[in-house]
A protein has these predicted regions:
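Specific transmembrane alpha-helix
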Residues: 3-21, 97-113, 127-183, 216-227
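Juxtamembrane transmembrane-helix termini
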Residues: 6-43, 48-64, 107-116, 171-178
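Small-polar-interrupted transmembrane alpha-helices in polytopic inner-membrane proteins
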Residues: 10-11, 52, 121-141, 192-203
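Membrane-helix interface segments
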Residues: 29-31, 69-70, 117-124, 183-189
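Membrane-interface helix-loop-helix regions
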Residues: 31-41, 46-99, 131-158, 225
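Alpha-helical transmembrane segments of multi-pass integral membrane proteins
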Residues: 58, 167, 171-172, 189-227
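Membrane-interfacial loop-to-transmembrane-helix junctions in polytopic alpha-helical membrane proteins
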Residues: 67, 84-88, 120, 150-160, ...
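Short, amphipathic, aromatic/basic-enriched membrane-interface segments that mark the entry/exit
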Residues: 93-98, 184-190
């Protein structure tokens, strides 16, 4: 377990809280509010990302960093370099931010659309459920019984569509916290203990990467235990 897994769930929880307050503060969630949300998020993340991307390009080009300059292309500019397909050889660290950026894009769009039909409480629940279930289905559909650890890492652990559920668990936690605050307050201690036990068990269970457990179930259990 590394800090990225914690970051995904925590990010979903914090951003989920912001979005919940946003959709409950008005009877009509307008498209201008979508752009306002994106503008705030992108002003916080994109300038630094592009600066580091540029620095990486020159470091690799002039062989200060030992990576492959031929792996660089426009997809790094729009965060599609690891959307469906694995990437490696250039700017390895960018995988997690790409997942985060797509979460910023997709979640508010779901909320905007579902609010046309459902009340805020049900809208947010459905959105969180979609974010949790779709990546699991995708991972199951793409199960590979001949994969090694390297390809498990780049093809499952570090692609956007495989990992959005980690943030989805954070969204679900923010929904429970917002609408069922008393339940949360009464049960946080036993939940923390049980979650910690589950996490310790999951991360210490040595299972080969070519199994359904490692490719499909593992990520869900880790995120659920953090939630």
């Amino acid at each position: 377990l590394d800090g990225v897994e914690l970051f995904f769930v925590l990010s979903g929880f914090l951003i989920g809280g912001i979005l919940l307050r946003e959709i409950n503060s008005t009877d009509d969630f307008k498209i201008t509010q979508l752009f306002h949300f994106w503008k705030r998020r992108w002003f916080r993340t994109l300038p630094t990302y592009y600066l580091i991307l540029l620095a990486n390009y020159f470091f690799v080009k002039y062989e200060i960093v030992n990576e492959n300059i031929n792996e660089f292309n426009y997809s790094f500019l729009i965060f599609t370099h690891n959307f469906f397909t694995p990437f490696y050889g250039f700017f390895w660290e960018s995988w997690s931010l790409s997942i985060e950026e797509w979460f910023y894009i997709i979640t508010p769009i779901f909320l905007f659309l579902f609010l046309k039909v459902f009340p805020p409480k049900l809208t947010f629940f459905i959105t969180a459920l979609i974010m949790i279930l779709l990546p699991c289905v995708y991972r199951f559909y793409n199960y590979d019984d001949s994969i090694d650890f390297f390809w498990w890492d780049v093809a499952f652990r570090k692609t956007v569509v495989c990992r959005l559920d980690s943030i989805g668990y954070g969204l679900f936690a923010s929904w429970v916290f917002y609408y069922y605050r008393n339940l949360w307050s009464k049960n946080w201690a036993p939940s923390f203990i049980l979650g910690s036990i589950l996490m310790i068990f999951v991360i210490n269970l040595e299972i080969d990467p070519d199994t359904i457990y490692k490719q499909v179930v593992y990520f869900s259990l880790v995120s659920f235990s953090i939630m």
